[in-house]
Amino acid sequence: MLFSGVYNYSTDALLWDDFLAGNQVAYACMYERYAKVLYNYGYKIAQNRQLTEDCLQDLFLSILETRNRLGRTDSIKFYLMRSLRRELVRRLQAESRFDADPDAIEFRVEFHYEPTWLDAQVSADQSAALLRELDVLPPRQKEALFLKYFDNLTYEEIAGVMGIEQSSAYKVIYKAIAALQKRVDTGVLLLLLMVAKDH
């Protein structure tokens, strides 16, 4: 990590406030903290490395250039994910990669079986079955589960990132979990979601 010790911001609010005040170290720290997460999320939407990198670079340049007009936020990750998603959707629409409906995004996240401590808790067959079921969920449900359990966003933040109402975020995640519960052992599902929360 490039910025530790004195530049190790304890909260996003403090980091954002320093960035808004023009602190270049805060800007660099913010980039270091969130660029990889943003790239991974953006790539799942765009499936294009160059486009994802371009949008990510443009996003960080844009917030630097417009920081005097930006408001406060308690969650930089949420703010940046929402902004990146909007820009990717705009550019993909311009390229006619999907129609004008942002819900048409094919959110591509594949869940792969990798031996972990989860194997000590459940059989390899159960783990593999659950991961196969995750792979066949509709893209919107996969994205919502990914944001909730792998990126640890709140329902309000998920709604903001995906451009939906908070009640819709609850429903999408509920439907995804309900679909999984019908096809896999509930205990295995709970273990996976607990593992995801820790990452």
Regions found by a protein language model. Give the residues of each.
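Structural recognition of an alpha-helix C-terminal capping motif at a helix-to-coil junction
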Residues: 40, 54-61, 74-86
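A short pre-motif secondary-structure segment
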Residues: 144-148
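Arg/Lys-rich amphipathic alpha helix in sigma70-family domain 2
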Residues: 65-72, 82-102, 123
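N-terminal module of bacterial RNA polymerase sigma factors
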Residues: 1-37, 63, 199
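DNA-recognition helix of helix-turn-helix
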Residues: 85, 89, 141, 156, ...
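Internal acidic/polar
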Residues: 8-9, 90, 98-123
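Amphipathic alpha-helical segment used for protein-protein interaction
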Residues: 21, 113-143, 153
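C-terminal edge and immediately downstream basic/flexible tail or linker adjoining helix-turn-helix-like DNA-binding
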Residues: 2-7, 160, 178-199
